[in-house]
Amino acid sequence: MEKKHLKILRNVRFFTAIVTLAMMAGLTSCKKTDDVPAKPIKYNFSAIPQKSLWLDVAKSQFIIAGTFQVDTIKLKEILETESGYLNFTLSIDSVLKGDLQSKELSFTKYIEKPLSSNDSNLFLLNGKKSIDFFIENPAGNGPLFMLGNIGNSLISKTEDTIKVIANEVKRQQEITDDKTFFSICPNDKNSARVKELIADMHIGTKANDAYIELEKMGFDAVPGIICQMDDRRELALKQISLENKNPDAWEAYSHYNPELVVDVLDAILDQIIGQNFGFIEDGGTEEKRANTVRAWRTYLWHAANDSLEQKQVFQETQKTAD
């Protein structure tokens, strides 16, 4: 009887050993799988549209639903004489993006002569419910500015437009959240070099060379810059000069005085891509910086997820619909 128990015990131990070895083999196999490099992320910057609702939402610091009032007599005077700035007031019903506590808002729009076809909305929507897209005054003080031209900064307020814009604001908050966003960030030599150059920005003797090299890297540096730009450390060199690529520019270089890493990276991104998501090249408020970072993250998310083929299919669909 005792021998029988010993035999059973030996069999149990043998079985346990086999199971243990199998589990170890499985763990080893999993580890090897984890070591296989992930497929590089492809960023299709050519698929980014020139005009899009998501771009307008990303660029805007504030999106407000309400009733705006414009002095149409003053507007006509400007159009009959010369271009100029016109002040507006807006009675606020709700805020779709941004943090505003007031019930009324003053803002400014530059009116060009001749009147743009889109500017007819100033007359059509005067005194009516509308949705307005705003950015802060680039100078950092004074009234808010409307985003771009009237066509994309002032639209009629309906339940459908409110829903669409509110959904886009929510979506951008979700895709720019760290956990979601960092899944599209690269882990390559360009990103590593960007990290090294950002470190050099804290050394007085190396900062200017870091700015120059980062700009020269061009689009190769863009994903790494955007993924690492949420950096509030002070710069060792708080000035940068970037060549004006616009042939109509009145000076050869634009000169900025960034204060933090995020400020100078925004200036370099604007220089490389030609896209502006805020005016923090000379510093800015925490809210302004945070909105700029979110906007650039939204831009990269679309570059990683919107293929050129998808854009072409959409364009063909639009042509068919027209």
Outline where the language-model segments fall.
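N-terminal secretory signal peptides that target proteins for export/translocation
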Residues: 1-11
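Transition segments tied to proteolytic processing and entry into folded domains
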Residues: 2, 30-212, 226-227, 246-249, ...
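Bacterial N-terminal signal peptides
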Residues: 16-26
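Structural detector for internal amphipathic alpha-helices that build alpha-solenoid repeat scaffolds
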Residues: 184, 206-217, 239-272
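Residue-level signature of the C-terminal ends
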Residues: 216-217, 228, 232, 271-276
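Eukaryotic acidic, Ser/Thr-rich intrinsically disordered low-complexity regions
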Residues: 286-321
